[in-house]
Swiss-Prot record:
This is Mitochondrial fission process protein 1. It comes from Caenorhabditis briggsae. One of its GO terms (biological process) is apoptotic process. The chain crosses the membrane at residues 36-56, 81-101, 128-148. Pfam families: MTP18. It is found in: Mitochondrion inner membrane. The keyword Mitochondrion applies. One of its GO terms (cellular component) is mitochondrial inner membrane. Involved in the mitochondrial division probably by regulating membrane fission. Loss-of-function leads to apoptosis. Keywords: Apoptosis, Membrane, Mitochondrion, Mitochondrion inner membrane, Transmembrane, Transmembrane helix. Its main location: mitochondrion.
Amino acid sequence: MSPVESSNVEKDIFRDTPVRFLGKRYANEVGEAFRSLVKPVVVKFSYVVAFGYVAADSVDKGFKESKKPHANDTEKAKRVAIIAVDTVLWQTFASVLIPGFTINRFCFFTNMLLEKSTKLPTNLRKWTVTALGLATIPFIVHPIDAFVEDAMNKTARKVYNY
């Protein structure tokens, strides 16, 4: 995209700005990283926050689409539904399920490795796992986003012609 084209494209606050990193989009990954140190209800709440982010982005995208001109009300309703569903799917996989699973398994196996190969005290081991889990989050973002984008282009988006 040329600089002129990119300046005409509206910035998506839910995908293209630091809002993603302010505890909303990645709330559940942070919850997963802290799993060994907090009560299960805290981890569950982190998923509530993450799904709240998914809902907010979906409503935002649907609302913006509803404000655009359409040939008729039927076409408008169809486009709004497609945009909202596409956003729910993309955000659920790219922001909640895949990253949450990735950090959960990373922390689980890191804990196992440290438990078997070191003599770290339990509390230090748990904090080390949490720190490593948190440090991993920035490295998984873009590969997961690209994977989900590609997977959706090859599957769901073909179904609803997005």
